[in-house]
Regions:
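Conserved Class I S-adenosyl-L-methionine
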Residues: 41-43
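Short alpha-helical segment that forms part of, or immediately flanks, the ligand-binding pocket
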Residues: 8-12, 16, 23-27
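Short catalytic/ligand-binding loop motif for oxyanion handling, primarily in non-cytosolic enzymes
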Residues: 4, 25-29, 122
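C-terminal amphipathic helix plus adjacent low-complexity
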Residues: 52-160
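Short glycine/acidic-rich beta->alpha loop that forms part of the nucleotide-sugar donor binding site
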Residues: 1-4, 11
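Short hydrophobic beta-strand element within catalytic cores of glycosyltransferases
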Residues: 16-19, 30, 36-38
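Short, solvent-exposed loop/turn segments at secondary-structure junctions
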Residues: 1-2, 17, 23-24, 75, ...
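Conserved acidic donor-binding loop of glycosyltransferase catalytic domains
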Residues: 20-21, 27, 45, 49, ...
Length: 160
């Protein structure tokens, strides 16, 4: 899934998550740079593109206490004429089982504490609360209107 709505709903319900580090699910991990402790922003992702490459990023970031991220170890690319490429991430099954065990070993109280921390982070610093989402939507619409450039007109001709 591109954004990970089910995992976002899970965190908002104060349930910890296990996610593949891919697409929008990266945003739900609360990744921070180890170098300065700052949360990755949309501008950071615009510069780097993605944290997909575990070789480059796994040791350079930390994550929120509500998530156990699982990094893709293999990526395949397929495609067709209508969809030129689709990148498919493959995780290491033993690593997934370790993540499940991690949450199991945390116990009920540990999972509840982590879930509450996740919901709090989503509503505040990560910005998934309704007020921030409305502001981002309004800002995006304003930016689209401000930067709109009409396409050059063209004529259609009927050939006999």
């Amino acid at each position: 899934e591109g954004f990970g709505l089910t995992t976002a709903e899970s965190v908002m319900a104060e349930t910890p998550i296990i996610v593949n580090v891919t697409g929008g699910m990266q945003d739900q991990c609360g990744f921070r740079k180890k170098s300065d402790g700052k949360l990755f922003t949309a501008n950071d992702y615009a510069k780097i593109g993605s944290l997909h490459n575990y070789r480059e990023w796994e040791d350079k970031v930390t994550h929120g206490e509500w998530v156990k991220p699982v990094w893709s170890r293999v990526q395949t690319m397929t495609g067709s004429v209508p969809t030129p490429y689709i990148i498919d991430d493959k995780v290491d099954v033993p690593e997934v089982s370790e993540a499940i065990r991690y949450w199991y070993d945390k116990g009920k109280e540990g999972r509840e504490k982590a879930g509450k921390a996740g919901r709090n982070a989503f509503l505040n610093e990560i910005g998934l609360g309704v007020d921030n989402q409305n502001k981002c939507m309004a800002d995006g619409i304003e930016k689209a209107i401000k930067n709109f450039k009409p396409k050059k007109r063209f004529n259609l001709y009927k050939l006999a």
